Amino acid sequence: MAFKNPETIGLHGGEYRSDPTTTSVAVPIYQTTSYQFKNADTAANLFGLKEFGNIYTRIMNPTCDVLEKRVAALEGGLAAVAVGSGQAASAFCVQNVCQAGDNIVSSTDLYGGTVNLFKNTLSMQGIEVRFADPKDPKNFEKLTDEKTRAYYGESCPNPYLRVFPIKEVADIGKKHGIPLIIDNTAAPVICKPLEHGAAVVMHSLTKYILSLIHI
């Protein structure tokens, strides 16, 4: 069943209805690190990615699986991956499309921690970040070359809250085969970046979604 109301998605999204053992409707917190395999063939298939299932908590955890599916449902996406922090999510998005020698074009309106990540950490990995003023979406195109692998922006930037022109920048990206990554931390309910052309959406979940309650 596909829910439409964001409150309902938050409570019941992600294909979870009840715990198969206790029938509890609350999602259990699985604290285990390891899982028992039915037999050697099952283990081989799981590690060979021929079957979907739990291997090791650092890779897959049933509690995280529900979280990932609910966030994906909230955004109208296909799937999601939960990582340790919002900054890890930003880095993960960029590092999955870039290698040393590549570049991305980012909005100048960014959370300070992301600016630090882009200017310092990624540069040490050989990834160049070019900054474009989003007031004119064409600025992204001006900084694009054959090594540009992604565009990056925040839907409602912290702290400026100047709304990012998602559709306009996404359209430019599609013309050049470049995906747009949107940090939707500030507006996960009122803004749906995927509907406006973004390819990837990320969140720092401890902010709007969890109201500063840590997972």
Cite the ranges covered by each PLM segment.
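Conserved N-terminal alpha-helix of the aminotransferase class I/II PLP-enzyme fold
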Residues: N39-A91, G113-T121
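Catalytic PLP-binding core of fold-type I/II PLP enzymes
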Residues: D145, A150, V163-E195, A199-V200
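Conserved small/polar residues in nucleotide/adenosyl-binding loops
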Residues: I213-I215
